[in-house]
């Protein structure tokens, strides 16, 4: 099956409150599939978006964790690393967002989020392999309070070129795929941070990137997970100490 072209979710769910240090744990390993996230974490958002794209709202329970007031039971009973996202499934807990979104795509019903085309799948593997380096390149100047670096410009220019590799759509593999999920939650944040803190528009002069962002914002399964931009900025200032 080919990757879906811009799938969306029409399911409007009532989001559960985030669980803090005084909360009780869910009945772990009772056979329920649970996705543990934080509403404001870009890595957890990847898994959340993937869940929505697959239409798993009724099959994968969302459990929100308050990372600023993390319950001890999360690390003790659920996921020893204590990070989000994690997935409780088949009596095991898995983590690491880039691995997890591929696991969800491969092991649950719903539209396939990676193509069968060999060239596109190979490029998807390359994009996944580069995702952490891209994140580091974009966040490093913000965390060190430095100016827009050559590394930032080069990383964004590479992304612009990557978005032109296939001409059958505005996404990394032409048509929408899981590779887009791997990058969009990071782009959502750095676009805000660089605009407000460096007066730098990451999409300026990069029409492919601008179109990618515009098209991603039309996908409901992603749009449902977005936060208010100024809230994300304030949160990053206070907790990541970006400036």
From Swiss-Prot:
Tissue: Leaves and roots. It is more strongly induced in the leaves relative to the roots.
InterPro entries registered for this protein in UniProt: Glutathione-S-Trfase_C_sf, Glutathione_S-Trfase, Glutathione_S-Trfase_N, GSTL1/2/3, Thioredoxin-like_sf
Coiled coil ranges: none
Binding-site residues for glutathione, renumbered to this chain: 70, 84, 96-97
Pfam families with a match to the protein in the record: GST_C_2 (PF13410), GST_N_3 (PF13417)
Induction: By N-(aminocarbonyl)-2-chlorobenzenesulfonamide (2-CBSU).
Region of interest: Disordered: 1-26
GO molecular function, one term: glutathione transferase activity
Residue ranges occupied by any GST N-terminal domain in the UniProt entry: 31-112
Domain annotation GST C-terminal: ranges: 109-240
Classification via PANTHER family: GLUTATHIONE S-TRANSFERASE L1, PROTEIN IN2-1 HOMOLOG A
UniProt family annotation: Belongs to the GST superfamily. HSP26 family.
Name of this protein: Protein IN2-1
Organism: Zea mays (Maize)
Annotated gene: IN2-1
């Amino acid at each position: 099956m080919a990757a879906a072209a811009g799938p969306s979710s029409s399911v409007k769910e009532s989001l559960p409150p985030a669980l803090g240090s005084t909360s009780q744990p869910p009945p772990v390993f009772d056979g329920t599939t649970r996705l543990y996230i934080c509403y404001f974490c870009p890595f957890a958002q990847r898994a959340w978006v993937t869940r929505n794209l697959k239409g798993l709202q009724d099959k994968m329970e969302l459990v929100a964790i308050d990372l600023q007031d993390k319950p001890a039971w999360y690390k003790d009973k659920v996921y020893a690393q204590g990070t989000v996202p994690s997935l409780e499934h088949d009596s095991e807990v898995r983590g690491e967002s880039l691995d997890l979104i591929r696991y969800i795509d491969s092991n649950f019903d719903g539209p396939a989020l990676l193509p069968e085309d060999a060239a596109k799948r190979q490029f998807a593997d390359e994009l996944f392999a580069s995702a952490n380096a891209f994140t580091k390149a974009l966040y490093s100047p913000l965390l060190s309070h430095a100016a827009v670096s050559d590394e930032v410009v080069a990383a964004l220019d590479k992304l612009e070129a990557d978005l032109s590799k296939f001409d059958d759509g505005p996404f990394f593999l032409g048509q929408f795929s899981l590779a887009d999920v791997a990058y969009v939650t990071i782009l959502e944040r750095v676009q805000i941070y660089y605009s407000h803190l460096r007066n730098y528009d990451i999409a300026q002069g990069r029409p492919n990137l601008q179109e990618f962002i515009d098209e991603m914002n039309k996908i409901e399964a992603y749009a449902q997970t977005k936060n208010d931009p100024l809230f994300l900025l304030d949160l990053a200032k206070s907790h990541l100490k970006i400036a």
